[in-house]
Curated annotation (Swiss-Prot):
Annotated source species: Arabidopsis thaliana
Disulfide bond residue pairs: C33-C80, C44-C65, C50-C74, C54-C76
Origin superkingdom: Eukaryota
A GO CC term assigned to this protein in UniProt: extracellular region
Protein name as annotated: Defensin-like protein 17
Gene responsible for this protein: PDF1.2C
Location (main, coarse): secreted
Region forming the signal peptide: 1-29
Modified residues (Pyrrolidone carboxylic acid): Q30
GO terms classed as biological process: defense response; defense response to fungus; killing of cells of another organism
Function per UniProt: Confers broad-spectrum resistance to pathogens.
Family per record: Belongs to the DEFL family.
Protein keywords: Antimicrobial, Disulfide bond, Fungicide, Plant defense, Pyrrolidone carboxylic acid, Secreted, Signal
Amino acid sequence: MAKSATIITFLFAALVLFAAFEAPTMVEAQKLCEKPSGTWSGVCGNSNACKNQCINLEGAKHGSCNYVFPAHKCICYVPC
């Protein structure tokens, strides 16, 4: 019993050391530019609906309702 506990402890320690030295992969962030939605009409009050419309209809990466004088508008975020 003591031998199996020692083996399990050793394997756990080896796993922790391996995970600690594993280098995370860095990916260069893609810059996004703001663009007013071309398909949204009216005041934007639902950021989730705006996001879905930007992604599905305009091919954007993201979308949200932002205040642009004089009202909230749906803004899509596209690669620059």
